Swiss-Prot record:
Its main location: cytoplasm. Its EC number is 2.4.99.17. Transfers and isomerizes the ribose moiety from AdoMet to the 7-aminomethyl group of 7-deazaguanine (preQ1-tRNA) to give epoxyqueuosine (oQ-tRNA). InterPro entries: QueA, QueA_dom1, QueA_dom2, QueA_sf. It comes from Salmonella arizonae (strain ATCC BAA-731 / CDC346-86 / RSK2980). It catalyses: 7-aminomethyl-7-carbaguanosine(34) in tRNA + S-adenosyl-L-methionine = epoxyqueuosine(34) in tRNA + adenine + L-methionine + 2 H(+). This is S-adenosylmethionine:tRNA ribosyltransferase-isomerase.
Length: 356
């Protein structure tokens, strides 16, 4: 399977640089997995698509202000993008500089360059940085960090992004990108879903900067997925198993919820799904046998990205690419601040041959 099989033409004008004024007023393209049928509507139509007893699984990670600017004490400018917080003093980060810092290099971070840190070690493409400050890492990031807007949102971050680029239910700090399907849920919609008897469960997957890395191989099977930390607690497992037992559906809100649940299912020893706490490198592409998810809420993803591959494995390649073609024709807004899809599972997707 070739990466170019997942390419599509996207006019620049369809990339959303700001969210809709009202979270739940975005457009919703519904794709019926088994047939490929498409329906156009608005996000609140989701209420009519779910049944009492269905379980929505959200990712409750919270985006940290992960982008830092500064310089080496010796002079050269640097940009630091936190990949993950290791503890209260140390981070693992990508560093952009004219010359990569060596272990022991002193860094002056923040717009005022008044936060002192040291690059202590290198781990492949990532740098371990230790802050020489009494405050915990998260407090430092909240004080001097910028929101890490994705590279395709071509503007500086603004104060408003600190809330707009978070889900309303975000709770556990650690992500450097928002689980964007969740951005469309506002408090009134969540209340209406509860009122209807829709159950809600929360996993945690701290989205890493690797989510924006392009696939740099020609053949999909050669791609090595980045690693991210995920938690699927016992109460989520219980909710999933109970829903399956009574004939209800499990609906993942976002690809990060998919990857969390499917990681927990892959690692399970005796049941369909068991609690999972750890790093996952799960890479879902056509041919993958889904184990847990019955439907998916997701945004529109980048051409040739691992996320459009995940969607293709769920809905079927032809159905997915047709839906994207229709979305472009109908001028849906794309990517993190864009519109959404509601997709039901296509059990025939696993048998589809891509690029033959």
């Amino acid at each position: 399977m070739r990466v170019t099989d997942f390419s599509f033409e996207l006019p620049e004008s369809l990339i959303a640089h700001y969210p809709q004024p009202e979270r739940s007023r975005c457009r919703l393209l519904s794709l019926e997995g088994p047939t490929g049928a498409l329906t156009h509507g608005t996000f609140t139509d989701l209420l009519d698509k779910l049944n009492p007893g269905d379980v929505l699984v959200f990712n409750n990670t919270r985006v940290i202000p992960a982008r830092l600017f500064g310089r080496k004490a010796s002079g050269g400018k640097i940009e630091v993008l936190v990949e993950r917080m290791l503890d209260d003093k140390r981070i693992l980060a990508h560093i952009r500089a004219s010359k990569a810092p060596k272990p022991g290099t002193e860094l002056l971070l923040g717009d005022d360059e008044n936060i002192h840190a040291t690059m202590t070690a290198r781990h492949g493409a990532l740098f371990e940085v230790e802050f020489n400050d009494e405050r915990p890492v998260l407090d430092i990031l909240n004080a001097i960090g910028h929101m890490p807007l994705p590279p395709y949102i071509d503007r500086p971050d603004e104060d408003a992004d600190r809330e707009l680029y978070q889900t309303v239910y975000s709770e556990k700090p650690g992500a450097v990108a928002a689980p964007t399907a969740g951005l469309h849920f506002d408090k009134p919609l969540l209340a209406a879903l509860r009122e209807k008897g829709i159950e809600m469960a929360f996993v945690t997957l701290h989205v890493g900067a690797g989510t924006f890395q392009p696939v740099r191989v020609d053949t999909i099977e050669d791609h090595i997925m980045h690693s991210e930390y995920a938690e699927v607690p016992q109460e989520v497992v219980d909710a999933v198993l109970a829903a399956k037992a009574r004939g209800n559906r499990v609906i993942a809100v976002g690809t990060t919820s998919v990857r969390s649940l499917e990681s927990a299912a892959q690692a399970a020893k005796s049941d369909l799904i068991e609690p999972f706490f750890g790093d996952t490198q799960i890479f879902i592409y056509p041919g993958y046998q889904y184990k847990v998810i019955d439907a998916l809420v997701t945004n529109f993803h980048l051409p040739e990205s691992t996320l459009i591959m995940l969607v293709s494995a769920f809905a079927g390649y032809e159905h997915t690419m047709n839906a994207y073609k229709a979305a472009v024709e109908q001028k849906y807004r794309f990517f993190s601040y864009g519109d959404a899809m509601f997709i039901t599972y296509n059990p025939q997707a696993i048998f589809e041959r891509v690029g033959e």
